[in-house]
Amino acid sequence: MIDKHGRNIDYLRISVTDRCNLRCIYCMPKMKGYIQENNKISCSDIFKLLRAAVSVGINKVRYTGGEPLLNEEISKIIYETSKLPQINDIAITTNGILLPQMAKDLKKAGLKRVNISLDTLKSDTFTKITNFNQITKVIDGIDTCLKLNLKPVKINTVLIKGINDLEVNDFVNLSREMPVEIRFIELMPIGEGAKIYEKGRVNIKELLMSRSDLIPIESLQNSTANMYKIKGGKGRIGYITPISCKFCSTCNKIRLTSMGTIKPCLHSNQEIDLKPYLNNEDVLVEKLKTIIFNKTFQHHINEENISRSKKMMYQIGG
């Protein structure tokens, strides 16, 4: 569906849980309660929303969390999604820890692509960022997805000054050896990330452009990443800068939180609760049409005195 700014909104990100098995320093506090089960949307609620979403032009779906693989019904959710003929792309964003034992079943259910969060290639730094020593499982998860041909396998790497910013070359070299897409992501001042943003933010473009061997390549339509490759490399490298160089004019997505609210913009405090409309498909469709048509043109997160999202990243499903 086309919004009032002329953008085709065809991409829905769905958070299926706010739970996670890591505690990344920019995302989730070490000690944190979760949404009560009776306040979450159920599997059947997700399907109701999906049916309404495809009727207004949604054709791409990504499942997020929290950690989406902690939702015991994730395979069922993906399978039911795959039965909708209008949906041509089903993906997940995961920390990868559970992929070694789950990836095969997820692909069988209909999963097409995987984004894996990995901020470091060093075990001690992984523990410092995530508060858990699980890097081996994540690496195994990447290998499993490559063997299953869940491609392109994208690795999301949030750069934090003084912690992992000196690993840029290590990740670039990884793209030389493996058929993966490395995507360096700007630290965002949301939730826990806001506490370390001023000291932790990195000029990703400047770091990458210090290399003379990067060859620019054309990005896909509506892609949020600026893409490059190395001559002879098996993979690709890119960077995503939603704060310093926002790409709102080509944004094509809306988000559904695990509480059943729609966020037209990740960085806005605006949320619309869809739970009251779940049992009336006609009303639900009309509500979605209104939300999409009125989607804000751009975020203002780097400006003062604006209405920022007050939720943590894991609650939003960023």
From Swiss-Prot:
GO molecular function, one term: GTP 3',8'-cyclase activity
Cofactor binding note of this UniProt entry: Binds 2 [4Fe-4S] clusters. Binds 1 [4Fe-4S] cluster coordinated with 3 cysteines and an exchangeable S-adenosyl-L-methionine and 1 [4Fe-4S] cluster coordinated with 3 cysteines and the GTP-derived substrate.
Requisite cofactors: [4Fe-4S] cluster
Positions contributing to S-adenosyl-L-methionine binding: Y26, G66, S117, M188
SUPFAM superfamilies, per the entry: Radical SAM enzymes
Binding site for GTP: R13, R62, T93, K154, K253, I254, R255
Catalytic reactions of this protein: GTP + AH2 + S-adenosyl-L-methionine = (8S)-3',8-cyclo-7,8-dihydroguanosine 5'-triphosphate + 5'-deoxyadenosine + L-methionine + A + H(+)
Domain Radical SAM core stretches: 4-218
Involved pathway(s): Cofactor biosynthesis; molybdopterin biosynthesis
Binding positions ([4Fe-4S] cluster 1): C20, C24, C27
4Fe-4S among keywords: yes
Chain residues that bind [4Fe-4S] cluster 2: C248, C251, C265
UniProt GO BP: Mo-molybdopterin cofactor biosynthetic process
Subunit composition and interactions: Monomer and homodimer.
Free-text function comment from the UniProt entry: Catalyzes the cyclization of GTP to (8S)-3',8-cyclo-7,8-dihydroguanosine 5'-triphosphate.
HAMAP family noted in UniProt: MoaA_B
Protein family (similarity comment): Belongs to the radical SAM superfamily. MoaA family.
The protein's name in its UniProt record: GTP 3',8-cyclase
Species of origin: Clostridium acetobutylicum (strain ATCC 824 / DSM 792 / JCM 1419 / IAM 19013 / LMG 5710 / NBRC 13948 / NRRL B-527 / VKM B-1787 / 2291 / W)
Record gene name: moaA
